[in-house]
Amino acid sequence: MGSPCHFALFELKPEFQLDLDQLATRYRELARNVHPDRFADAPEREQRLALERSASLNEAYQTLKSPPKRARYLLAMNGNEVPLEVTVHDPEFLLQQMQLREDLEDLQDEADLAGVATFKRQLKVAQDELNQSFAACWNDAAQREHAEKLMRRMQFLDKLSHEVRQLEERLDD
């Protein structure tokens, strides 16, 4: 992992539960201070450093504002990088994934905007439950494997949520 720590950049304790409004406010404050345009008349070295600080800040913000990315980052901070691609040995979740994808495909085939809205609400509830479960166990070494499983589920639901938003946009047109 690169330094500095994403949480330290925002003067936050490394925790899963964050106040996203506070994070966004702090991001805007910090971004104003390191924005490369403020260093347009500075020597080239200072311009480059400002660009690097701005890029680091943006990366940190994107990581911390996304629950799945924040979960992966916290797990990595605790000692082990979690591989991006890994075979999932979670038959129950694999079945759930297949069912959710089939449901979404049916909604697309039927062009059912109301059904998509319901699906989206159910997905949000599932994401919130996963977030709460992860928050309760991520920092416990004895539950490391469970935390990784939850993080992978979070990643899947996040990707599915993105697909739902894309479907909504297509059906709205």
From Swiss-Prot:
Keywords carried by this UniProt record: Chaperone
Domain of life, per lineage: Bacteria
Signal peptide start and end residues: none
InterPro entries named among the record's database cross-references: DnaJ_domain, HscB, HscB_C_sf, HscB_oligo_C, J_dom_sf
J domain segment(s): 5-77
Coiled coil: none
UniProt-listed GO biological process terms: [2Fe-2S] cluster assembly; protein complex oligomerization; protein folding
A GO CC term assigned to this protein in UniProt: iron-sulfur cluster transfer complex
One GO MF term attached to the UniProt entry: protein-folding chaperone binding
Family: Belongs to the HscB family.
Subunit structure, interactors included: Interacts with HscA and stimulates its ATPase activity.
NCBIfam families cross-referenced by the UniProt entry: hscB, PRK00294.1
Function: Co-chaperone involved in the maturation of iron-sulfur cluster-containing proteins. Seems to help targeting proteins to be folded toward HscA.
This protein's name: Co-chaperone protein HscB homolog
Gene: hscB
